[in-house]
Curated annotation (Swiss-Prot):
SUPFAM superfamilies: Ankyrin repeat
Subunit and partners: Protein phosphatase 6 (PP6) holoenzyme is proposed to be a heterotrimeric complex formed by the catalytic subunit, a SAPS domain-containing subunit (PP6R) and an ankyrin repeat-domain containing regulatory subunit (ARS). Interacts with PPP6R1.
Record's function text: Putative regulatory subunit of protein phosphatase 6 (PP6) that may be involved in the recognition of phosphoprotein substrates.
Keyword Repeat (UniProt): yes
Cross-referenced InterPro entries: Ankyrin_rpt, Ankyrin_rpt-contain_sf
SMART domains in UniProt: ANK
Protein known as: Serine/threonine-protein phosphatase 6 regulatory ankyrin repeat subunit B
Residues that span the membrane, as ranges: none
Pfam families, per database record: Ank, Ank_2, Ank_3, Ank_4
Keyword Nucleus: no
Assigned keywords, A-Z: ANK repeat, Repeat
Superkingdom, taxonomy of origin: Eukaryota
Length: 993
């Protein structure tokens, strides 16, 4: 809020401040605006209310001042009067209809303001006009919260007397008692508790009033609460007690009081941290730590991640506290979950004094920690040279590697502090040592662009052309130092984008310095790694323009030669990763811009595929061809740009194309850019291609148009754009399917309706594909009810045409009962008798698949139960042969299917059930057979059901057959033709037994 000069204000405002009613009357008489606004949108009435001058307020209101005017914080004159505790001003404003419920931007009413400012008399005037004193502000706080927060006992008394909810909570579930306890208002705390406030109440994070008082060091409130017998070790959601909170905030007086009252000094929180851990880490926790240690706190207790209090002092460099812990039995070489001792942690964070304390107390400098690293590794890695000096000791094997084979010199090279490197080298560190990947310290220094480290290592004899296990030299790593990673790291420290960019530029200059130094010291830029890439490839891949310029200048061999042996050229790598500046450097060399990678792709193809517009523009400006096809998919850069919807790249490519047919170029599958754009749903790309007059009716090798693909993939806006181009809707693919077939199959009812209207207006419209299936077949097969309704609105679909496996068959075979109902309702029940080319009815299909509900639906529409197909089988036979017990049950018991019907091989339903080993089906059929002759009925092989059941091991069925009079002496065809003993069902049964 700005502070305004009174002399700069209107005369009326100055007169109000001077308190002269006569001058005010004179100014008003001279038509001075009584509702004038200052820069904060405050009116003269706000001023008078602030001053509490009732007479002037009355005068202004009678002269037309708006009594409920709001400033830019939405404060009314009543808010101002209440804040000034002027009872008379409040009464005058209310007399003139001031809104007692008005809210400011924080949703605070005049009562909130009165409560916060101890305006008791004003509150007494306002409260009778309110429906409730428990109205909350934006933070959920009531007037009682504000009164308690500010310690106004009289106001708290008034509000409680007027019905304020003593346990009302704000949006963080904090009560008035929390706020009073936090602020140390003992009288208010006592008053609230005496009026029934819940002393053990918790907010959303589980903090009690005791936690609140302890956190802010309110010792008197803490004592009062403890005297009331509150649970001293009550925890919040993080498992922290009041003692934890007091230690964390360095409230030593509270800590002392809590300990005296018996608080558990070793209580762990959810992460296993005790109050001692917090005291060890806290900025002001030194005295707290002393108190805890002197009162029996376990100095070696470890958290869930293995950290002891000594570890915590090491993180934050609390060396005095570390001495206290050690003197009281703290284990110096205690390890955490990662294997780190306090010495490792202190080395990691560079706390030299603490390191000195630990070493003096006998800490093991050669103890292995995370990844088997020494404390010296961590100090060197984090560039703490003074710590390194402290950690070096006589007899220490300085070249001992960690888990990955890295020595301390490797760590120092990665950390970038040249003093660490010099210190280690002077102590005998071997710069020839390699890690498990074959990398020397020089590789690490180069990868992190630490120029002075590189300089020191090379000067002392490091081999600049030493290769690691992947064949990479320091030059490879310097050329590939990741600017994007460095940018991310820098971004955490710099919010300003300009500063961030400057930092990035400095880092790239440092990379160039490193590269230049290596080249000056005979680094060979033509050395290739095991994949055939040299330093130029790496610089291109990571977009280092200056490094590229330097390498190209220093490389005697031609640029094209550098590509041999590599799967991708530097041009490909720069284009793929979007490094247009690096690309521009490469383009200055006389190279073939259409050079291909191992898959035949050009740099332009890769740039277009990734959507790097600036790279695409640079390449086409230098003459790169947009028509080169790769070796695999035969796509062009046009196809590549469309696949991922990179419309800007596509536009650039189309604008450069001389040939108008470029827009319809095809890949190996015959797909045009338009087809791909539609298939992937890239609306802007589709719009651009149509604008460039792409052929909407071009077909691929499968005969599909863009419309086919759009409907298959379901991209609505793309399809709509194609339809607006008068695309052919009856064009058939290689299987004879039109877009209507696909719309019906995919359930796109809206498109289907639109396509139908267009199709029916054409004279020659054939709705059958190569197998005779119509859109209605496909809609029924896939259960698309909305599409079926659309199709049945057309007369031509209310009769079955095409493949004799009718739409009803299609619906039934996939258990789409609702679709079948639609067909039966729209046509008539006679369709239940239709047959496919094998003579099977829909009932056969239902029985075959055991779709019981569909079966019942067909039977309700008088489906012929005993109709036989071309092989003489009824629906019952079909169900029995396939073991569909549900269908058999309905057909036998409800539909009373004929059990005597025989197929071409004279098999009855019972024969078929037994032949496939379907015991349940056989028993269901047997239950309905009473005729002994049917039990002994023979098929073409002279086999009775008993033969078949016995041969298939159906013991229960055999027993039931015998019980119903099956003949055990019947002879089948095989037995009658043999010369040996006759085989009867009886012998088969005996074998089974």
């Amino acid at each position: 809020m700005a502070v305004l000069k009174l002399t700069d204000q209107p005369p009326l405002v100055q007169a109000i401040f001077s308190g002269d009613p006569e001058e005010i009357r004179m100014l008003i008489h001279k038509t001075e605006d009584v509702n004038t606004l200052d820069s904060e949108k405050r009116t003269p009435l706000h001023v008078a209310a602030f001053l509490g001058d009732a007479e002037i307020i009355e005068l202004l209101i009678l002269s037309g001042a708006r009594v409920n005017a709001k400033d830019n914080m939405w404060l009314t004159p009543l808010h101002r009067a209440v804040a000034s505790r002027s009872e008379e001003a409040v009464q005058v404003l209310i007399k003139h209809s001031a809104d007692v419920n008005a809210r400011d931007k924080n949703w605070q009413t005049p009562l909130h303001v009165a409560a916060a400012n101890k305006a008791v008399k004003c509150a007494e005037v306002i409260i009778p006009l309110l429906s409730s004193v428990n109205v909350s502000d934006r933070g959920g706080r009531t007037a009682l919260h504000h009164a308690a927060l500010n310690g106004h006992v009289e106001m708290v008394n008034l509000l409680l007397a007027k019905g304020a909810n003593i346990n009302a909570f704000d949006k963080k579930d904090r009560r008035a008692l929390h706020w009073a306890a936090y602020m140390g208002h003992l009288d208010v705390v006592a008053l609230l508790i005496n009026h029934g406030a819940e002393v053990t109440c918790k907010d959303k994070k589980g903090y009690t009033p005791l936690h609140a008082a302890a956190s802010n060091g309110q010792i008197n409130v803490v004592k009062h609460l403890l005297n009331l017998g509150v649970e001293i070790d009550e925890i919040n959601v993080y498992g922290n007690t009041a003692l934890h909170i007091a230690c964390y905030n360095g409230q030593d007086a509270v800590v002392n009081e809590l300990i005296d009252y018996g608080a558990n000094v070793n209580q762990p929180n959810n992460n296993g941290f005790t109050p001692l851990h917090f005291a060890a880490a806290s900025t002001h926790g030194a005295l707290c730590l002393e108190l805890l240690v002197n009162n029996g706190a376990d100095v070696n207790i470890q958290s869930k991640d293995g950290k002891s209090p000594l570890h915590m002092t090491a993180v934050h460099g609390r060396f005095t506290r570390s001495q206290t812990l050690i003197q009281n039995g703290g284990e110096i070489d205690c390890v955490d979950k990662d294997g780190n001792t306090p010495l490792h942690v202190a080395a990691r964070y560079g706390h030299e004094l603490l390191i000195n304390t630990l070493i003096t107390s006998g800490a093991d400098t050669a103890k292995c920690g995370i990844h088997s690293m020494f404390p010296l590794h961590l100090a060197a890695l984090n560039a703490h040279s003074d710590c390194c000096r402290k950690l070096l000791s006589s007899g220490f094997e300085i070249d001992t590697p960690d888990k990955f084979g890295r020595t301390c010199l490797h760590a120092a090279a990665a950390g970038g502090n040249v003093e660490c490197i010099k210190l280690l080298q002077s102590s005998g560190a071997d710069f020839h040592k390699k890690d498990k990947c074959g990398r020397t310290p020089l590789h690490y220094a180069a990868a992190n662009c630490h120029f002075h480290c590189i300089e020191t290592l090379v000067t002392t004899g490091a081999n600049v052309n030493e290769t690691d296990d992947w064949g990479r030299t320091a030059l490879h790593y310097a050329a590939a130092s990741d600017m994007d990673r460095n940018k991310t790291i820098l971004g955490n420290a710099h919010d300003n984008s300009e500063e961030l960019e400057r930092a990035r530029e400095l880092k790239e200059k440092e990379a160039t310095l490193c590269l230049e130094f290596l080249l000056q010291n005979d680094a060979n830029p033509s050395i290739r790694d095991k994949e055939g890439y040299n330093s130029i490839h790496y610089a291109a891949a990571y977009g280092h323009r200056q490094c590229l310029e330097l390498l190209l200048e220093r490389t005697n061999s031609g640029f094209e030669e550098s590509d041999s042996g590599a799967t991708k050229s530097p041009l490909h790598l720069a284009a793929y990763n979007g490094h247009h500046q690096a690309l521009e450097v490469l383009l200055q060399s006389l190279v073939d811009l259409d050079i291909r990678d191992e898959k035949g792709r050009t740099a332009l193809d890769l740039a277009a595929f990734k959507g790097h517009t600036e790279c695409v523009e640079a390449l086409i400006n230098q003459g790169a061809s947009i028509f080169v096809k790769d070796n695999v998919t035969k796509r062009t850069p046009l196809h590549a740009s469309v696949i991922n919807g990179h419309t800007l790249c596509l536009r650039l490519l189309l604008e450069i194309a001389d040939n108008p047919e470029a827009v319809d170029v095809k890949d190996a599958k015959g797909q045009t850019p338009l087809m791909l754009a539609v298939a992937y749903g890239h609306i802007d790309a589709v719009s651009l291609l149509l604008e460039k007059e792409a052929n909407v009716d071009t077909v691929d090798i499968l005969g599909c148009t863009a419309l086919h693909r759009g409907i298959m993939t379901g991209h609505e806006e793309c399809v709509q754009m194609l339809l607006e181009q008068e695309v052919s809707i009856l064009c058939k693919d290689s299987r004879g399917r039109t877009p209507l077939h696909y719309a019906a199959a995919r359930g796109h009812a809206t498109w289907l309706s639109e396509l139908l209207q267009m199709a029916l207006s054409e004279e020659d419209c054939c709705f059958k594909d190569n197998q005779g299936y119509t859109p209605l077949h496909w809609a029924c097969y896939n259960g698309n009810e909305n599409c079926i309704e659309v199709l049945l609105e057309q007369k031509c679909f209310r009769k079955f045409i095409g493949n004799p496996f009718t739409p009803l068959h299609c619906a039934i075979i996939n258990d789409h009962g609702n679709c079948a109902s639609l067909l039966l309702g729209a046509i008539d029940s006679s369709i239940v008798s239709c047959r496919d080319d094998k003579g099977r009815t829909p009932l056969h299909a239902a029985a075959f698949a055991d779709h019981v509900e569909c079966l019942q639906l067909l039977l309700r529409h008088s489906a012929p139960v005993n109709a036989v197909d071309n092989s003489g089988k009824t629906a019952l036979m079909m169900a029995a042969e396939n073991g569909q017990a549900g269908a058999v049950d309905i057909l036998v018991n409800s539909a009373q299917a004929d059990l005597t019907v025989k197929d071409k091989d004279l098999n009855t339903p019972l024969h078929l059930a037994c032949s496939k080993g379907h015991e349940k089906c056989a028993l269901l059929i047997l239950d309905k057979i009473q005729d002994e002759s049917l039990i002994n009925e023979k098929n073409n092989a002279l086999q009775t059901p008993l033969h078949v059941a016995a041969r298939n091991g159906l013991k229960v069925v055999v027993e039931e057959l015998l019980a119903k009079g099956a003949c055990v002496l019947a002879v089948d065809e095989n037995a009658s033709r043999s010369n040996g003993p006759r085989s009867t069902p009886g012998t088969a049964v005996q074998k089974e037994e």
